[in-house]
Amino acid sequence: MNEVVQSPAIQPLPKSAPTAGKQNLLDLDRAGLEKFFVEVLGEKKFRAHQVMKWIHHRYVTDFDEMTDLGKVLRAKLQAHAEVLVPNIVFDKPSADGTHKWLLAMGVDGKNAIETVYIPDKTRGTLCVSSQVGCGLNCTFCSTATQGFNRNLTTAEIIGQVWVAARHLGNVPHQMRRLTNVVMMGMGEPLMNFDNVVRAMSVMRDDLGYGLANKRVTLSTSGLVPQIDRLSAESDVSLAVSLHAPNDALRETLVPLNKKYPIAELMASCARYLRANKRRESVTFEYTLMKGINDKPEHARELARLMRQFDNAVQAKDSGKVNLIPFNPFPGTRYERSEEAHIRAFQKILLDSNVLTMVRRTRGDDIDAACGQLKGQVMDRTRRQAEFNKTLQAGKGSDAAA
């Protein structure tokens, strides 16, 4: 998977502004597209399936190029619909094969997000963003330094997959270079619940990108009610940004812990696994920072927490730990743990029979490593005001408050 097929540089599509009265088909999953074709276009459902394959399998956005559609249907589509994908500001390869795209969201140039493709020997993983910025203020994350602006639409989320898959020459079921998607980019996915779940549906649909449920992973900082809702409405792998083994420390790193402490978070994760026997484990992400959370006593405390989690689920290896060496960014006060401390931390966990791996740092030469994403954004004060407005408005079940 390390070899990425070189394709011609992808130019931004000439049209990026939505047209009033037209439906962006990237905003729709299979059910939504079928409904649009039946109720708006007066067509059969199978026509929606044809168009979905043109968009997500062949990366065609011009209805006139969808050659197995009749002229009448193409005319209807031209009148009522469009396919708008994110504009590419730049794409940047890393020496290790990692690739980062900066994608413009909207037409004002003020909102941009980053998407990262990470190739490995047996798989290719795309790290996808769910928000422009983030308002959770995790103190060790670069994205948090920019504050929050807005949620991404379904089209803007799945559009990241479209851009990357097109660049890679990915053909579902034939030439698969994109094997996994992780919702671990900019933003808290569960604060944009509906759009994220709809986008993940397209990722897992055979008419979309055909990924198995377990190959789509949602990472959350720990919004307990939304984890329970996710369990009922979707079926993907769950990862939790833990980063500390106790509430006192986690509250300094992940302020959301004050609202949803570790005991509540772990209980919701146990419910998530128990609700579906096909769900085998939850991954707990733990970023190691020098002198902060990398001491032997932290490792022993984390091991106890994982044993308690196994007992709650009543299954061995229900919790897996992913140790992440901290990736520095300008202005941070944190430092990466020394390699010897990382290995010693891992050994304590392994000796306690906790499945543990250390994530290799990839893409740090292009600021694409874990915790380094932040895009081109507005000033923090304005963005935080937008986040507070979102919380106050409630935004249904998509808000954290």
UniProtKB/Swiss-Prot annotation:
<keyword id="KW-0489">Methyltransferase</keyword>
<feature type="binding site">
    <location>
        <begin position="187"/>
        <end position="188"/>
    </location>
    <ligand>
        <name>S-adenosyl-L-methionine</name>
    </ligand>
</feature>
<keyword id="KW-0808">Transferase</keyword>
<keyword id="KW-0479">Metal-binding</keyword>
<comment type="function">
    <text>Specifically methylates position 2 of adenine 2503 in 23S rRNA and position 2 of adenine 37 in tRNAs. m2A2503 modification seems to play a crucial role in the proofreading step occurring at the peptidyl transferase center and thus would serve to optimize ribosomal fidelity.</text>
</comment>
<keyword id="KW-0411">Iron-sulfur</keyword>
<dbReference type="Pfam" id="PF04055">
    <property type="entry name" value="Radical_SAM"/>
</dbReference>
<dbReference type="GO" id="GO:0051539">
    <property type="term" value="F:4 iron, 4 sulfur cluster binding"/>
</dbReference>
<keyword id="KW-0819">tRNA processing</keyword>
<feature type="binding site">
    <location>
        <position position="327"/>
    </location>
    <ligand>
        <name>S-adenosyl-L-methionine</name>
    </ligand>
</feature>
<dbReference type="InterPro" id="IPR048641">
    <property type="entry name" value="RlmN_N"/>
</dbReference>
<keyword id="KW-0004">4Fe-4S</keyword>
<keyword id="KW-0408">Iron</keyword>
<dbReference type="GO" id="GO:0030488">
    <property type="term" value="P:tRNA methylation"/>
</dbReference>
<dbReference type="GO" id="GO:0002935">
    <property type="term" value="F:tRNA (adenine(37)-C2)-methyltransferase activity"/>
</dbReference>
<dbReference type="GO" id="GO:0019843">
    <property type="term" value="F:rRNA binding"/>
</dbReference>
<keyword id="KW-0949">S-adenosyl-L-methionine</keyword>
<dbReference type="GO" id="GO:0070475">
    <property type="term" value="P:rRNA base methylation"/>
</dbReference>
<keyword id="KW-1015">Disulfide bond</keyword>
<keyword id="KW-0963">Cytoplasm</keyword>
<feature type="binding site">
    <location>
        <position position="219"/>
    </location>
    <ligand>
        <name>S-adenosyl-L-methionine</name>
    </ligand>
</feature>
<dbReference type="InterPro" id="IPR004383">
    <property type="entry name" value="rRNA_lsu_MTrfase_RlmN/Cfr"/>
</dbReference>
<dbReference type="GO" id="GO:0070040">
    <property type="term" value="F:rRNA (adenine(2503)-C2-)-methyltransferase activity"/>
</dbReference>
<dbReference type="InterPro" id="IPR040072">
    <property type="entry name" value="Methyltransferase_A"/>
</dbReference>
<keyword id="KW-0698">rRNA processing</keyword>
<feature type="active site" description="Proton acceptor">
    <location>
        <position position="114"/>
    </location>
</feature>
<feature type="binding site">
    <location>
        <position position="138"/>
    </location>
    <ligand>
        <name>[4Fe-4S] cluster</name>
    </ligand>
</feature>
<dbReference type="GO" id="GO:0046872">
    <property type="term" value="F:metal ion binding"/>
</dbReference>
<protein>
    <recommendedName>
        <fullName>Dual-specificity RNA methyltransferase RlmN</fullName>
        <ecNumber>2.1.1.192</ecNumber>
    </recommendedName>
</protein>
<dbReference type="Pfam" id="PF21016">
    <property type="entry name" value="RlmN_N"/>
</dbReference>
<comment type="similarity">
    <text>Belongs to the radical SAM superfamily. RlmN family.</text>
</comment>
<feature type="binding site">
    <location>
        <begin position="241"/>
        <end position="243"/>
    </location>
    <ligand>
        <name>S-adenosyl-L-methionine</name>
    </ligand>
</feature>
<dbReference type="InterPro" id="IPR007197">
    <property type="entry name" value="rSAM"/>
</dbReference>
<feature type="disulfide bond" description="(transient)">
    <location>
        <begin position="127"/>
        <end position="370"/>
    </location>
</feature>
<dbReference type="InterPro" id="IPR013785">
    <property type="entry name" value="Aldolase_TIM"/>
</dbReference>
<dbReference type="GO" id="GO:0000049">
    <property type="term" value="F:tRNA binding"/>
</dbReference>
<feature type="domain" description="Radical SAM core">
    <location>
        <begin position="120"/>
        <end position="365"/>
    </location>
</feature>
<dbReference type="GO" id="GO:0005737">
    <property type="term" value="C:cytoplasm"/>
</dbReference>
<feature type="active site" description="S-methylcysteine intermediate">
    <location>
        <position position="370"/>
    </location>
</feature>
<dbReference type="InterPro" id="IPR027492">
    <property type="entry name" value="RNA_MTrfase_RlmN"/>
</dbReference>
<feature type="binding site">
    <location>
        <position position="134"/>
    </location>
    <ligand>
        <name>[4Fe-4S] cluster</name>
    </ligand>
</feature>
<feature type="binding site">
    <location>
        <position position="141"/>
    </location>
    <ligand>
        <name>[4Fe-4S] cluster</name>
    </ligand>
</feature>
